[in-house]
Design a protein with these regions (language model features):
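A hydrophobic, multi-pass inner-membrane permease signature
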Residues: 1-177
Length: 177
């Protein structure tokens, strides 16, 4: 969360393309992930983990301790307590994080272009919308505008389907005063 995303893209691109060698010793072997969706998934997972940790930790800390303590008294293990009590009670926080992460990944232009390149078969939705502007007679803004409106349909469906959890998930981990 401290280092800006843009500063870490080139080192990550070098890592995905050729691995990591330090003083002649191969630390991470050549991954050859450049130009694949796996590289974009790794990047988005790595950049999304701090937000997930921040949001879900605060949300889970706001859950009532008496519920967890009663599960321990009943003889539930840590895994049983987590999967049968904490996780179902955290659905609102998980849905809020899932909404944030989906909207960030879906609307991402920079990370996808850096790791995927400009091959037509590897372009994501935002890259396709950006390429709609150049025509034979100049820029065709009506194509870009209509492409942007059409590309907003999927995020709107996701947001409206998770909307009831969204506010509860954000408020659930906040400080009560």
């Amino acid at each position: 969360m401290i280092i800006p995303l843009q500063m870490s893209l080139i080192p990550l691109l070098k890592l995905m393309k050729g691995g990591a060698i330090l003083f002649g010793v191969t630390i991470i072997p050549e991954l050859s992930l450049n130009g694949t969706f796996v590289a974009v998934w790794f990047a988005h997972t790595g950049f999304g983990l701090p937000l997930a940790t921040f949001l879900l930790r605060d949300f889970m800390m706001s859950l009532p301790k008496s519920v967890v303590e009663s599960a321990k008294i009943d003889g539930a293990s840590h895994l049983t307590t987590f999967f049968k009590l904490v996780l179902p009670l955290s659905v609102a926080g998980i849905a809020a994080f899932a909404t944030f992460q989906f909207l960030w990944v879906y609307n991402d232009f920079l990370v996808a272009n850096v790791f995927m390149g400009i091959k037509p078969e590897n372009l994501v939705v935002t890259s396709h919308v950006a390429q709609l502007t150049v025509g034979n007679y100049g820029e065709e803004w009506h194509l870009r505008t209509s492409g942007a409106v059409i590309s907003m349909i999927v995020p709107l469906i996701v947001f409206f389907s998770l909307q009831r959890y969204f506010v509860r998930g954000l408020i659930g981990g906040s400080v009560k005063g």
